[in-house]
């Protein structure tokens, strides 16, 4: 089988969340960080025939890049990558070294929904980098919800700071849900977004079967 560019993109994103991944037979990929404060699940076009434990996902992706448009044969203990006369045997890790992602869909607690475009996500990531922002602040005030990216007042001692703002729409209640920038590791795409009173943010892509659950700062008020 060949691994599509879309699936490689997802694996690259997952590698920023956790260096290891345990792939079950089928077409579902899932990951979480060690805390866990980030969880993600994706449905891909490939059908993995066996259980695949990869301890160093960056190394596996590097091997794929090295072999180019190769065929990958996922066997019981190894993956065999072939391209013309070239071949690589990539040995799986011991499954005990790779923790399986636990994806449990929370129910209830939703209090605000909005939509992010692919461009919104890219701009949010750029703004966080440009302003060295520690958090993304989702603020509901006077019936208007806004995403604010800058230095929170509590950390800035009320001095002026550069701030990027994105109006998200109308809201019922006041809130301040803070998502640490370090957990906002999402692939730019179009997303339906849900903020939850259990202090997390949920994103579901509208263009591909990809979902994220991101934990908020415990000091958030909702």
Regions found by a protein language model. Give the residues of each.
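Secondary-structure "cap/kink" motif recognition
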Residues: 102-107
């Amino acid at each position: 089988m060949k691994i599509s560019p879309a699936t490689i993109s997802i694996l690259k994103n997952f590698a920023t969340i956790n260096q290891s991944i345990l792939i079950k037979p089928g077409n579902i990929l899932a990951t979480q960080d060690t805390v866990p404060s980030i969880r993600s699940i994706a449905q891909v076009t490939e059908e993995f025939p066996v259980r695949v434990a990869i301890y160093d996902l960056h190394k596996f992706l590097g091997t794929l890049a090295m072999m180019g448009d190769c065929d990958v044969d996922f066997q019981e203990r190894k993956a065999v990558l072939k391209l013309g006369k070239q071949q690589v045997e990539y040995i799986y890790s011991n499954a005990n070294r790779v923790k399986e992602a636990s994806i449990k869909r929370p129910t209830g607690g939703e209090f605000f929904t909005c939509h992010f475009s692919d461009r919104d996500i890219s701009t949010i990531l750029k703004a966080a980098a440009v302003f060295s922002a520690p958090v993304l602040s989702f603020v509901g005030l006077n019936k208007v919800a806004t995403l604010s990216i800058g230095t929170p007042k509590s950390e800035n001692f009320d001095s002026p700071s550069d701030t990027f703002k994105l109006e998200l729409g109308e809201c019922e209640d006041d809130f301040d849900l803070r998502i640490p920038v370090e957990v906002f590791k999402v692939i730019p795409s179009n997303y339906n977004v849900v903020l939850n009173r259990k202090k997390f943010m949920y994103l579901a892509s509208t263009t591909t079967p990809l979902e994220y659950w991101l934990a908020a700062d415990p000091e958030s008020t909702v």
